[in-house]
Amino acid sequence: MEEFKGYLEKSRSKQQHFLYPFLFQEYIYALAHDHGLNVNGSIFYEPAEISGYDNKFSSLLVKRLITRMYQQNYLINSVNDSNQNRFVGHNKNFYSQMISEGFAAIVEIPFSLRLASSLEEKKEIPKSQNLRSIHSIFPFFEDKLSHLNYVSDILIPYPVHLEILVQILQCWIQDVPSLHLLRFFFHEYHNWNNLITQKKSSYGFSKENPRLFWFLYNSYVVECESILVFLRKQSSYLRSTSSGPFLERTHFYEKIGQHLIVLCCNDFQKTLWLFKDPFMHYVRYQGKSILASKRTHLLMKKWKSYFVNFWQCHFHFWSQPCRIHINQFSNFSFYFLGYLSNVPINPSAVKSQMLENSFLIDTVTKKFETIVPIIPMIGSLSKAKFCNVSGNPISKPVWADLSDSDIIDRFGRICRNLSHYYSGSSKKQSLYRIKYILRLSCARTLARKHKSTVRAFLQRLGSEFLEEFFTEEEKVLSLILPRISYPLHKLYRERIWYLDIIRINDLVNHL
């Protein structure tokens, strides 16, 4: 890693990143395979359980790969022999996976260094580490959204052509061989046209090369948000130096400059005045984003117009305006990070008395609420074969061959993870129903394995069976308040947000 930093420091003055020679270094693939960049603090999170090839790394295979690349016959061999296993015991696309992993590891370096340098200048590294949890978004919602009026529910459009992804990287990395190699990946895998596909409100990814996929997707999303950042920086009284990278990009103003002038009615400063809104907030996770404001519906329509026109002229594809929904908080609920959130208006009357006169004062309070969406969650549990489409628990036959302890541990872990993730719910009834489904599904699976009834099996296990499904908070409260006979749901009315959740739960991600 230090060698990479030294190399890039020398080339930074030329604003060029010649990354292609790194592909011929053996340790690149060891670094990519072992996820060394993630361990050392890479900005791109990748689940360790997602892997496209055998976890056992072989230096011999890497040397053969490097040799074939030097001989300039790898491209021909990969095209003619893409469906055959190259080595016994390894996946058929091992070479392509290794190169894509190495390419992703190399191309991450300039972006990682740029982010690290910007954080060092602003001295925000400890702050950014504390806010890595996606649960940190919801306390922000609690503080801000109750004072706002309108919200735009935005689905970031997906690229219609993979060449768009190459052009995005071209604005940041002026290394033609590396970009040609990326194009080769796209042409070799015919099914990569489904690299980014629309699936409800989220994006689906192929799992063959997850590191490269996530990097390309993050780059694309940053480009989609560039118009938002650009306008906010230009409209700010305190100009930030972080808007500098926009000036370095070769095609930014050529592509959208003229179109922006038309939209702004030849007066850019008057248009920027519309965006000087101190009560506007923007939050995004994956392909779903929220734009909220305290100002009028007209301003939100202006933002929608700018987003749609920018996506059309900059990415050369038609962006459906229906992907941006503008609504009032008082009568709208939006899905975000697996929660169904809203800001309802609660009217109340307060009686006031002054001397002999008394009168009623009508007041309105707004409170941010987060609810577990039970119907989509039942759909996710049904797809995972924990219940049927009606929410009735069923046994999971594929786990019936495991030991009793493994079955209970798996169900208990899923239940605790969901309880941990949905700990910030305002109303716990839906969460208790999900836990009931998982507990009874576990009991049915064990009863199926032992060819017994659920009632008989629960009587034999007793309370020890239920303890596996308790969260740490429930165990602590049961020790502190052992004599209180109130049911558990009365003890958990307060929302709890955790700072150790760095990605969305898999079952929740089906929403």
Curated annotation (Swiss-Prot):
Keyword Ion transport listed: no
Family statement: Belongs to the intron maturase 2 family. MatK subfamily.
GO biological process per UniProt: mRNA processing; RNA splicing; tRNA processing
Alphabetical list of HAMAP family matching this protein: MatK
Protein name: Maturase K
Subcellular location: Plastid, Chloroplast
GO molecular function annotations of the record: RNA binding
Claim: RNA-binding is one of the keywords in the record: yes
GO CC term, one of those recorded: chloroplast
UniProt keyword terms in alphabetical order: Chloroplast, mRNA processing, Plastid, RNA-binding, tRNA processing
InterPro entries: Domain_X (IPR024937), Maturase_MatK (IPR002866), Maturase_MatK_N (IPR024942)
Function: Usually encoded in the trnK tRNA gene intron. Probably assists in splicing its own and other chloroplast group II introns.
